[in-house]
Amino acid sequence: MKLTLLGAPGAGKGTQADILSRKLGVPTISTGNILRSAIHDGTSVGLAAKSYIDKGQLVPDDVIIEIVQERLAQPDCAEGFILDGMPRTIPQAEALIAHGIELDTVLSLEISDEEIVQRMAGRRVCPRCGASYHVQMNPPRKDGVCDACGTALIIRADDAPETVRDRLHVYHEQTEPLKGFYEKLGLLRSVENVGSIEDVSREIFRSLGIGE
């Protein structure tokens, strides 16, 4: 299965993408993680992207498309993939189609802006491997430490409330129109992100027609 997850920053895309990845046996391709790795490594792409991410702005399409194309060409994507954070604009969606990257389903996670601001205040991320946690909804086994690699978790600058609101404005202006774009193609499925992580996962499985 080849699908992408849509939703505002903090809507739970990363968490649900990881669950779907294990369920379907296909990799999650997170543009956010790819870019953060590039920033951490000090690559030219990372340095170019850093100023946009820190301000809550979108990274230019040409940078995103190049990174995604390289990743999808790897062997582990042959049987399918889950895109997390791509596309973010209609031009990006059109570029995916133009480059022969076809999707089976587009899943949109729905949640209010105020709920997102509250949730992101509790988000913690691993600067080394990119794993994401939440102090209440998805805490690590040891407080402040990544389960996967043991690195101390951090609060990202773009999770600050004022930056979150800026990112939400960008989302509504530039990314939300994708729902209409994919609805016209018959690919869109929407799921309300309410209840526990497990509740939302069950609703996603039902929407995609896969068993628990």
Kindly give the residue locations of the regions a language model identified.
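Glycine-rich phosphate-binding loop of ATP-dependent small-molecule kinases
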Residues: M1-E212
